[in-house]
């Protein structure tokens, strides 16, 4: 089995160094597929893609402002999350999103055209106790680190009410395992916390404060990052239908509790 998680993950870095970003995310993925085809064509090939393949299209949804988050109406067709049929066209992806979209599509093509047992998991915010989050990526891990270090946390754009779904590495690896036991060719799954595990940045900060008993300094920066999602929750229905034995163990509160405990131990 090949599990391809290697990437250049920073939007800002990709904008400043687009050729290097493309070489890493796109060409690097193509090289791995060619090597798999040549030396181990029967091995399942798992690619960790990203929800950024959808660009900023989720921002075109009818999103309402609530007290601490942006949210969809419960009657909205996407209330339970973005599914795999959501458009990846006619939108701003960011340079990072473009290189990852190429990788996503070429992984699908090697499955459907060449016959490799490939799958793309389009991830939301993925994390766990050993995640070394930074300002440019690793949302929850970085938030916990800055908060418990008693530094000021910057909420960039959308009043800090933008929503993300959060998936623990334990649950993600179990999804990989389910696919490994029964692989298909050229499949795509949205993979995140879904409605079971999601929060806004404000809600995440409030959770950290309640868990750690530390008051967090905050500043709001009005200008959002290019292509940033106002609201994104993954619809996990397709994967759960294909792999009904997969169950989530960690919700956002449990994830943050583990991140706080890990930081305090370190």
Residue ranges: model-predicted function:
Residues 101, 114-117, 127-142, 151, ...:
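Glycine/proline-rich active-site loop of Rossmann-fold NAD(P)-dependent oxidoreductases
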Residues 169-172, 176, 191, 201-204, ...:
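Non-catalytic, hydrophobic alpha-helical segments
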Residues 69-86, 143-157, 182, 210-221:
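A short C-terminal helix-loop "cap" of Rossmann-like NAD(P)-dependent dehydrogenase/epimerase domains
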Residues 237-238, 250-266:
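Amphipathic terminal alpha-helices
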Residues 1-124:
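N-terminal Rossmann-like NAD(P)+-binding domain of SDR-like oxidoreductases, especially those catalyzing
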Residues 169, 188, 224-247, 251:
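Conserved C-terminal active-site "lid" loop/helix of NAD(P)H-dependent oxidoreductases
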Residues 31-34, 166, 171-174, 178:
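Conserved mid-core alpha-helix of short-chain dehydrogenase/reductase
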Residues 158-159, 188-189, 202-205, 213-231:
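C-terminal "lid/loop" region of Rossmann-like NAD(P)-dependent oxidoreductases
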